[in-house]
Amino acid sequence: MQYQEVAGGICAPKGFAAAGVHCGIRANHNEKYDLALIKAEVRCAAAGVYTTNKVCGAPIKVDRAHLKDGYAQAILVNSGNANTCAANGVALAEECCALVGEALHIPAEDVLPASTGVIGQPMVIDPFARGIPAAAAKLTATAQGSTDAATAIMTTDTHKKEYAIQFELDGKTCTVGAIGKGSGMIAPNMATMLAFYTTDAAVSPALLEKALKTVVPGTYNQMSVDLDTSTNDTLIIMASGLAGNPEICEENADYDAFVAALTAIAEHMCAEHAGDGEGATHLITCEVTHAPDLKTARAVSRSVVCSNLFKAAVFGRDANWGRILCAIGYTPGDFSIDKVCVWLSSKAGEVYVCENAAYHPYSEDEAAKVLAEHDILVKVDMGTGEASAKAWGCDLTYDYVKINGDYRT
């Protein structure tokens, strides 16, 4: 399937506007945007997936209630405070939804809140009471609106994350756009990671939810920075239907094409998140092929990108392939490692370091050149089947410890 990258992020699909403002949630950052608002022209089919952490943010509890009917029209996101483990958290999130509803003239139940930031900090309504009307007044269906919203949700991210692609459904041009944040507390089973998708494809609520839950296991659940699963992981999608394609109401060719488009944009966003891991100097992608089954392929690729020993080796530009084999070896499951082959690759070239689970002659100098690049691909051929999977991670650096040691200061 062909995709074309387009500008505009979440405002690229028809029917969406966005804004970002500073409202004072980040009291020690006088100018930094800390509140994002996304609004649809029409009531949208909507779906979400959330953290697996038993401690979850108050906004997630509100989202789950508001999404029971499968529809939404606005998303409100704040950074600087997670609204987690706060006595008044749910009530405050509901009050924020009411303020958005009042500002946009929509039901409060059609508003989905999300928060990211420090866990366990008190939260008050005052900044939201100022910021929500300001964000509503600033809403724009332009690329700048998406950029401002993407900027407002950042915490320790070093750059904004947004992307959009176009594709065809039944002769109609459809668009999917995304923004996201997250560079720490990122581990499989969603990550401290917020992601918001918009699309103008017409998809029923039931099929939209199914599509999202089909895409997440092979993308967002395959991403890791530090093995910490956040309390606030949130991925929400709204579908306006304004592209004019026949509504996808069953699992047919159009549904498969839509899932493929979602997968493409999710893979791009995962690479953006992992490559911007706290203190990271390298994006590590592990691509497993010829695994005995999909479960094993996913588990092995996750093990490699989660290995602190291998992550540290990449930081040191050390082609220590034994650490890759070690990570594969402790992966749960019943599979053989006898035919495992490993390559390290980047735009500087490729080195074949392991053949049939044993050393393959290579140049350490060439390997160091490969590992000097930002984007590193680890190719693992298990030689035992036809299944494949990817996972995304980053190297482990001194700065990761420094950033997290200073997080609240």
Task: Indicate where each model-derived feature is located.
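A structural signal for small-residue-enriched, beta-sheet-centric alpha/beta enzyme cores
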Residues: M1-A91, E95, G101-T409
